[in-house]
Amino acid sequence: MNEEVNKIITLCGKDWAKIGVEFIFLGGKQECENCKIKKTCLKLKEGAKYKIVGLRDGAVQECPLHDEGVVAVEVVELPIIALVDSKIAVEGAKIHYEQRKCDVYDCSMYSLCHPIELNNGETVIVEKVIGDAPEQCRKGHSVIVAELRRAEE
C-alpha cells in the first residue's frame, strides 16, 4: 500500500495522537451534529481500522468528546485480515464479503471469519493471499487467510 497516496488528514484526541496508534473509527456521535469541524473528523469510514502515520502542526481544537481537545493527524486505512472462501480468494479479485453463519464462538479463527471492520455484503478487493488457515475449519469450510481492502465507491 502506498501510504503517501492513501494518507487522510483527520482529527483525533490530543492525548492519543501518537504515530503508530491504531484505532477503529466508530462514527460520529450526537455531540458532533453542530460542530464546525465535524467534516474533518467524520470523513473516515465507519468500522474501518486506521493507523496514525503522521502528526500535523496546528492548534488544539476544542471537542466535547475529548477532554484534551483534538489535533490534526495523518492516518492510513489498514488492510483487513480475514478468512475467505478458498475458491474466490484470488489476488486482485473484487468480491462481496459474506459473513459465515457460525455458532462455534470458541473457535480460534472466529475473529478472522468475522472481522469487525467489515459489514456483510461489503465489496472488497483481495490484495494478497497470505496462506492457509491456522487450523481446519470445524464447520468444514475451505478457507484461506487473505489481506482485503475496501473497494472504492
From Swiss-Prot:
Lineage of source species: Archaea, Methanobacteriati, Methanobacteriota, Archaeoglobi, Archaeoglobales
Protein's organism: Archaeoglobus fulgidus (strain ATCC 49558 / DSM 4304 / JCM 9628 / NBRC 100126 / VC-16)
InterPro entries per UniProt: UPF0179 (IPR005369)
Any single Pfam family the record assigns to this protein: UPF0179
Stated family: Belongs to the UPF0179 family.
Protein name in the entry: UPF0179 protein AF_2154
Superkingdom of origin: Archaea
